């Protein structure tokens, strides 16, 4: 099987590299990845997949399926292709998180596995999931039941230096505080004003005080998006936004309400009116299916990849977390550089263009496909994955 997978990977490599490179050269922000999603869909159609696009109301989402006439498990590979603002040429978007390569890896894994399902039975599904960096299409997909007919979902993210097994991520929710005060001349009639900027500053102060009583896994970080227009005018309208994160979604719910109270208290203290809203979708924590995680590691070893590291400790938040509560899921990492380069940088984006990165991309796609093959052909493996997932619920 190793030889077959390696041979297929060689056959499709030029197309997969071209896909990754084209998206690198034409970076698109979340929900406007029109060319990127088009390129994904066209390549999958070329290799016999039936593609639905747009998908679930998202213009840049898609679902590509290769179905056997025989029954069997349904294996999903999730693809991302959104860029980050400010990391490209002339301050435009750029692929500082390597999603050009991430998406190509999932497409490659789907194509490789599709070569076997006519014999084994089952489905191969490649899901195009826009806007991971912001709105997180996987959240909407999970809410709409997209993953409920799938037996396993995989996605592998580029990183530096080492391979890492799938680990944890932080649950995350968002909140925007919009304060309404009353303008006045800041020197001649300050007593006539109600200072919306004071409310914003007090919100930050309240949250900073809250940090003393939060758990070690809690993270709260925010920005001021509107802070007034002139120094001699008391600001009448100011806005701030926060990400609120925690290790588990149950604690996040409690922490989020505490942050809400910080904003309410600031409004009360300053006399401002307050409107609140989430400005992005909430992400659940990632509940890695360890049986599937071990299977991926085993599959990579079968292809000659040793030294896969335990999960890292630098937790962010991923929309795959929402998937992990409705379908057995893993989110491991593969290296695209031999030196430590931070993500969300121009240097990391450039690393996706190296031969080393492209070798690891194809290697990883093969491992994902081989893990899928084991599920398709080994009922006991699928049973163990399902058993662990049911215990999560």
Description of each model-found segment:
Residues 2-96, 100-121:
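Acidic/His- and Gly-rich active-site-bordering loop/insert found
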Residues 20, 27, 145, 211, ...:
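Sec/Tat-exported extracytoplasmic proteins
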Residues 76-78, 175, 180, 331-336:
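Non-cysteine beta-strand/loop elements that form the S-adenosyl-L-methionine
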Residues 73-76, 123-125, 151-154, 329-332:
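Structural motif
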